[in-house]
Amino acid sequence: MTKDMTTGAITPLLVKFTIPLVLGNLFQLTYNAADSIIVGKFVGEEALAAVGTSNPLMTLAILFINGMCLGAGILVSTAFGAGDHKLVERQVSTAAIAGTAFSVAFSLLCVLLATPLLRLLQVPADILPMAVRYLRIVFSGLIFTFFYNFLAAVMRALGDSKSALYFLMVSSVLNIGGDLFFVKVLSWGSEGCALSTVLSEAMCCLLCAIYIKYKVPILCLGRRWLVFDGKLLKKIVSYGWASAMQQATVQMGKIAVQGIVNTMGVSTMAAFAAASRIDDFAYTPQQNIAHAMTTLMAQNRGAGKKDRVKEGFRCGIRIELVYAAGLTVVCFFGAEGIMRMFAEEPEVIELGARFLRLISLMYFLPALTNGIQGFFRGIGDLKITLRSSMLSMAARVPSAALLVLYFHMEIEALPWSYAFGWFLMLAYEVPPMLRFLRNGTMENE
C-alpha cells in the first residue's frame, strides 16, 4: 500500500501520516523501557545500571544503521513523488544488497569492540562483565535491526506509515513477554533482556518482509527484483552517510555525557538510565514527526511543488510544539510517580525526578530543532543537519563536563548542557531555513 502525498489537504495528510509513526515509537520505547523496568524490579540496581550504561552504545549502532536507511528513504520518496517507479525499484534493491553486507560486518565489529568501548565510558568494574554480555547479545542481532529499519523506511517513503506500526505492536508484546520469561522465570538477568530484544526484532523484520512481498506491488521482492546499480549506490551512500553521521554524532554526544555520568556514582547512573528512558518518550516521537515532514517534503520536492514543501514545514512545527507541551505537563507533574516504575531505591527516584522536572521545561527546544532538521532532510540538504548536530554536541559535552567537574553540580547539570547545545543548533539552522521560506530555493537550484 502506497500513498501519494503530493495532492490533498496538507494538514490532515501530515497528521494521519504522523500518528502511526508516533504510536510506533511509543511502542518501541515501551518495550525498550520494559528492559529497564523488569531488570530494575527483578534483578536490581547493578543490573539496571549495566543495561543503562550499555544503552548509549547500543543506540549509537542502531541510529547509525537507521540513518543509512533514512538517507536511502529520502531518495525513494523523491523518486516516488516524481512518479519514477523503475528508479524506486533500483534504489531499494541496491540499498538492500549493500545494507545487508554492511550490517553483517558492522555487527561483527561491534561485538569485538564491546569491552574496550565500555571501558572507554569508564563503566565501573563491578558491572562491566554484565554490561559486556548484554551489549554483545544485542549487537549480534544488528542484521535484524537493519532489515526492519530499512523496510520500514521504504514503506514510509512510499507514504505508508501504518503497516510498520502493526508489526511493531506485535514485536513489543513479544519483547515484554520475553523479558518476563527470560528474566523472571529463567533468571537470566540482563542477558535475558538482550535476547528478548533480538528475538522480537527478528519477528518484526520477518512480518515486514512478508507484508511488502504480497501487499506492495511496486516492490515485488524476489530474484528478478534484485538489481545492484553501482552508480546509484554512490548517491545512496552519500545521502545515507550524511544521515547516519548526523544520527551518530548526536548519540556520540550522549555517550560522552554518559561517561561523565559514570563518574557520579551508581545511584546517579541508575537514575540517569531510568530518566533517559522516560526522556526518550519526548525526543523519539519528535524525531518521528520530523520523519513524516521529511517524507511529505521529499515527495513534493520530487514533484516540484515548493509551496506544499513550505506548508508541510509549518504544519509539522505546529505538531512538534503541541506534542512537546503535552509531554512537559506529564513529566513535570508526574516525575516521581514515573520514576517509581523504574526503581525502588529512594535516592534513585529522587535524582531521576529532579532530572525530569528540569528537562521537561526544555522540551520545546528539541521540538524546534527536530522539525527544522526534518525540513532540511526533505529538501535534500543533509549537510546542514550534520553540521548543526556536530555543533550541538560540541557544546553539550564540554558544558556538561564543566558543570559537573568544575562547578560540582549534580544531575541538573545535564539538562542545562542539553539546552546550551539546542540553542546553538537553532542559531545555526534558523537563518538558512528562513532564506528558503522567503525565496523557495532548493538544493542545487
Pin down the residues of each PLM region:
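Residue-level hotspots within the lipid-embedded alpha helices of multi-pass solute transporters
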Residues: N25-L29, L63, S103, S107, ...
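Helix-terminus/linker motif at the lipid-water interface of multi-pass membrane proteins
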Residues: L26, T30-A49, L118-A125, F181-S190, ...
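Alpha-helical transmembrane segments and their lipid-water interface positions
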Residues: Q28, N32-V39, I62-C69, G73, ...
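Small-residue-rich hydrophobic transmembrane alpha-helices
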Residues: L48-L108, T145-A164, A271-A335, P366-G380, ...
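N-terminal transmembrane alpha-helices
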Residues: M5-F42, P56-G71, L75, T100-S107, ...
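Short runs within selected transmembrane alpha-helices of multi-pass transporters and secretion channels
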Residues: C69, I137-R156, A164-S172, C193-C208, ...
